[in-house]
């Protein structure tokens, strides 16, 4: 499946149906009173986070979403039917922005979380509403109110526990493939990975999600190479695993290059817990390995792990270190209170279903 992490979408909620002008007509009743019903409410446009999606590719082929209009009221005080809602299904981790791409509308981080992006127009009053003591036969009704329309942007930030960062060909995809069932493309040339990949790692019967993003190079924050646009997918992680290839001539410089790009990107990425590992050590002899490990330790200020996805050396130790940080972070974080029902704009339920919003607001 192709990966797409942003999409531009036009949405429009349904117009409200018009009220009816009608009078009671029965045998032997010459002057029946008004009995025009109200118009139905227009359908809403919702967005919902669902499980099983990790791309916005569907929105490349459909960018317009319109809810149906409410039907007009009818005689005998019959209210028109409400319009049908439209729901945009998006991956968990999707953020919705206004057209300016700066104003955040909502951030969907929980499966089943829903948000009303555009409210349907209220139906108009029928003439039965306008009967008074001085006007027993009103011959007018209200039209329905128009729905809302806007253009929005969808931005996906994948939900993962740990993120893999490093220069191109640092062994990130090989690491992911060796500890999870993910099958990213692996080849001996730069930028083999062109989009993020996710995998579930298991260590000591505990699972966590790993995210592998395309490699960073010097100047990525200025658009060099693939740039830093995919760094958003590790913003939500608990810890970063920084891999430096043992094949780099200057491993200390390689570490600092990526670190500088993380600082230039911002969004507190450099404040995250970090594990540093010298990868692909199977290509070095003992003397060279010792030399490069010492150089990398000096650059990062800590003793790096030594790993090889080919031989399996050091892999278990790194996974356990990642697990410990993730478990500690999850323990320290206060459990979020997920309400079963919130205001009309946002609804979250245990089953991921909308249990309804405000009632009694079908009229203007």
From Swiss-Prot:
Enzyme Commission number: 3.6.5.-
Domain of life: Bacteria
All copies of domain Obg, residue ranges: 1-159
Sequence positions that bind GTP: 166-173, 191-195, 212-215, 279-282, 308-310
Cofactor: Mg(2+)
One GO cellular component term: cytoplasm
Binding-site positions, Mg(2+): 173, 193
Region named Disordered: 333-364
Keywords assigned: Cytoplasm, GTP-binding, Hydrolase, Magnesium, Metal-binding, Nucleotide-binding
One Gene Ontology term of the molecular function aspect: magnesium ion binding
Name of the top EC class for this enzyme: hydrolase
Residues annotated as domain OBG-type G: 160-327
Localization: Cytoplasm
Biological processes, Gene Ontology terms: ribosome biogenesis
Entries under Pfam families matching the protein: GTP1_OBG, MMR_HSR1
InterPro entries for the chain: G_OBG, GTP-bd, GTP-bd_Obg/CgtA, GTP1-OBG_CS, GTP1_OBG_dom, GTP1_OBG_dom_sf, OBG_GTPase, P-loop_NTPase
Primary location recorded for the protein, binned into one broad class: cytoplasm
PANTHER family: DEVELOPMENTALLY REGULATED GTP-BINDING PROTEIN-RELATED, MITOCHONDRIAL RIBOSOME-ASSOCIATED GTPASE 2
Similarity comment: family membership: Belongs to the TRAFAC class OBG-HflX-like GTPase superfamily. OBG GTPase family.
Subunit structure: Monomer.
Function: An essential GTPase which binds GTP, GDP and possibly (p)ppGpp with moderate affinity, with high nucleotide exchange rates and a fairly low GTP hydrolysis rate. Plays a role in control of the cell cycle, stress response, ribosome biogenesis and in those bacteria that undergo differentiation, in morphogenesis control.
UniProt-recorded name of the protein: GTPase Obg
